C-alpha cells in the first residue's frame, strides 16, 4: 500500500514538474512574440513623431491633406485578449512586412503593451496637426506618381557675361608682328690670309747625350773659338766682328734657369745644354746670320760631344732647316 502511494506521488510530482516546464516555455515564447511585435510599432511611432506631416506631404506630390485637429481614441487591449490570442513567429513577420510596405496608412499611434503586466498601459501619442477636412484622405505614395520637376533657367543666367571673342585673329596678328623678316643670303667671306709676323725668334739647342752634362771649361773654350764674347745679361753674344765689336747677330744662354753664366766659376759649372737664339729681322742679311748660327751650333756640339736640336727639342733635319728659312722670308716680306 505504501509503495503504491509512493509511486502515485512520484508520478504526480513528475507530471507537475513537466507542466511547470511547459508553462514556462509557453510563457517565454509568448513574451518573445510580443516583444518582436511591439518593437517595429514603437520604431514607426517614433519616426512619425520626429517627422512633420508637412514634409511627408511634400514627398507625395501635389496632394495636400487639410483639416482640423482630430483626435482618435487609442485602442485599448486587455490581458484577456492577449491570453486568448496565439502569436507565433509567422504572424509577427507578416505584421512587420505589412507595416513596412505602407507606413503612411497607419496614422493612429499604436499602443504599447507589456505582457509582463496584468493590465495594458496605453501611451498617449502627441497630437498631430492635420490641415484639411474632418475626414482626411491619405493617398498611398506608391499609387500617385511623382511629377518630375523641370528646373527652368533662372534670371541670373540672363546676366551672364557674353562669350569672349575668339583669340585666333589676335594670335595671328601677333604672329605677323613677331615673324622676322627673311634674312638676305650672305655672301661667302673671302679667305683672309694670315698676317705674317713682323719679327720672329729662331732657337737652336745644343744638348749633351742622354744622361750626360756639358762641362764648364770645355764649353767656355768652344764658345771662345766660335767667336762668342761674354757680355750683357751674363750671357754670351756673337757680334759682327769676332773680336766683340759691332752689332749682335745672335746670343747663347744656359738652358737651366736663370740662363746666365758665371765666368769666374766655369771650372765648377756643368749644364745639360745651351740655347742659341737670334732675332729676325737683324743686322745684315738674316739668312746669312742664321746660316752662321747653325754652323756655330754644330761646331759647339762637336766640341762638347752633344747634338743639335730644333725649337721643339727634336733632332735637326734638313726639312726643319728649310722651315726656318721660310719663316725668315715671311718676316722679311712682312717688313718690306
From Swiss-Prot:
Question: Carries keyword Cell inner membrane?
Answer: yes
GO CC annotations?
Answer: cell division site; plasma membrane
> Which of the residues are on side Periplasmic?
1-6
Sequence intervals crossing the membrane = 7-27
The membrane topology of this protein is: Single-pass type I membrane protein
What segments bear the compositional bias annotation Basic and acidic residues?
A: 40-51
Single biological process term from Gene Ontology: FtsZ-dependent cytokinesis
- Where in the cell does this protein reside? Cell inner membrane
Q: Which Gene3D superfamilies match?
A: ZipA, C-terminal FtsZ-binding domain (3.30.1400.10)
Q: Where is the composition biased (Polar residues)?
A: 126-138
Does the keyword Cell inner membrane belong to this entry?
A: yes
Kindly state which keywords UniProt assigns to this record, in alphabetical order. Answer: Cell cycle, Cell division, Cell inner membrane, Cell membrane, Membrane, Transmembrane, Transmembrane helix
Coiled coil ranges (UniProt) are: none
Q: Where does the record place Low complexity bias?
A: 76-89, 179-190
Q: Which SMART domains match?
A: ZipA_C
Q: What InterPro entries does the database record attribute to this sequence?
A: Cell_div_ZipA, ZipA_FtsZ-bd_C, ZipA_FtsZ-bd_C_sf
Q: Where is this region: Disordered?
A: 40-190
Q: Which residues lie on this side of the membrane: Cytoplasmic?
A: 28-336
Q: Which PANTHER family match?
A: CELL DIVISION PROTEIN ZIPA (PTHR38685:SF1)
Report the family membership. Answer: Belongs to the ZipA family.
Subunit structure comment from the entry: Interacts with FtsZ via their C-terminal domains.
Q: What does this protein do?
A: Essential cell division protein that stabilizes the FtsZ protofilaments by cross-linking them and that serves as a cytoplasmic membrane anchor for the Z ring. Also required for the recruitment to the septal ring of downstream cell division proteins.
Full protein name: Cell division protein ZipA
Organism, scientific name: Pectobacterium carotovorum subsp. carotovorum (strain PC1)
Taxonomic lineage is: Bacteria, Pseudomonadati, Pseudomonadota, Gammaproteobacteria, Enterobacterales
Query: Corresponding gene?
Result: zipA
Amino acid at each position: 500500500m505504501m509503495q503504491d502511494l509512493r509511486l502515485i506521488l512520484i508520478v504526480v510530482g513528475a507530471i507537475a514538474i513537466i507542466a511547470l516546464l511547459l508553462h514556462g516555455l509557453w510563457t517565454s515564447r509568448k513574451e518573445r512574440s510580443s516583444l518582436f511585435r511591439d518593437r517595429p510599432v514603437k520604431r514607426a511611432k517614433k519616426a512619425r513623431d520626429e517627422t512633420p506631416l508637412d514634409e511627408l506631404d511634400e514627398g507625395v506630390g501635389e496632394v495636400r491633406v487639410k483639416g482640423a485637429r482630430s483626435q482618435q481614441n487609442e485602442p485599448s487591449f486587455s490581458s484577456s485578449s492577449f491570453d486568448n490570442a496565439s502569436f507565433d513567429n509567422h504572424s509577427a513577420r507578416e505584421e512587420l512586412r505589412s507595416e513596412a510596405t505602407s507606413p503612411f496608412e497607419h496614422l493612429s499611434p499604436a499602443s504599447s503593451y507589456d505582457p509582463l503586466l496584468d493590465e495594458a498601459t496605453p501611451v498617449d501619442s502627441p497630437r498631430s496637426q492635420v490641415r484639411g477636412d474632418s475626414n482626411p484622405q491619405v493617398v498611398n505614395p506608391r499609387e500617385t506618381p511623382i511629377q518630375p520637376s523641370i528646373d527652368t533657367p533662372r534670371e541670373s543666367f540672363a546676366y551672364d557675361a557674353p562669350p569672349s571673342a575668339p583669340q585666333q585673329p589676335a594670335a595671328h596678328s601677333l604672329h605677323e608682328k613677331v615673324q622676322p623678316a627673311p634674312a638676305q643670303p650672305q655672301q661667302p667671306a673671302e679667305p683672309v690670309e694670315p698676317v705674317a709676323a713682323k719679327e720672329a725668334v729662331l732657337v737652336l739647342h745644343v744638348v749633351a747625350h742622354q744622361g750626360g752634362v756639358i762641362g764648364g771649361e770645355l764649353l767656355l773654350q768652344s764658345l771662345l773659338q766660335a767667336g762668342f764674347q761674354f757680355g750683357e745679361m751674363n750671357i754670351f753674344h756673337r757680334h759682327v766682328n769676332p773680336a766683340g765689336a759691332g752689332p749682335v747677330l745672335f746670343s747663347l744662354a744656359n738652358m737651366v734657369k736663370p740662363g746666365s753664366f758665371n765666368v769666374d766659376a766655369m771650372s765648377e759649372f756643368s749644364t745639360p745644354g745651351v740655347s742659341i737664339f737670334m732675332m729676325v729681322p737683324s743686322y745684315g742679311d738674316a739668312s746669312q746670320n742664321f746660316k752662321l748660327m747653325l754652323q756655330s751650333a754644330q761646331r759647339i756640339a762637336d766640341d762638347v760631344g752633344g747634338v743639335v736640336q730644333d725649337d721643339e727639342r727634336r733632332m735637326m733635319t734638313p726639312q726643319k732647316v728649310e722651315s726656318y728659312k721660310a719663316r725668315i722670308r715671311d718676316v722679311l716680306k712682312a717688313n718690306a
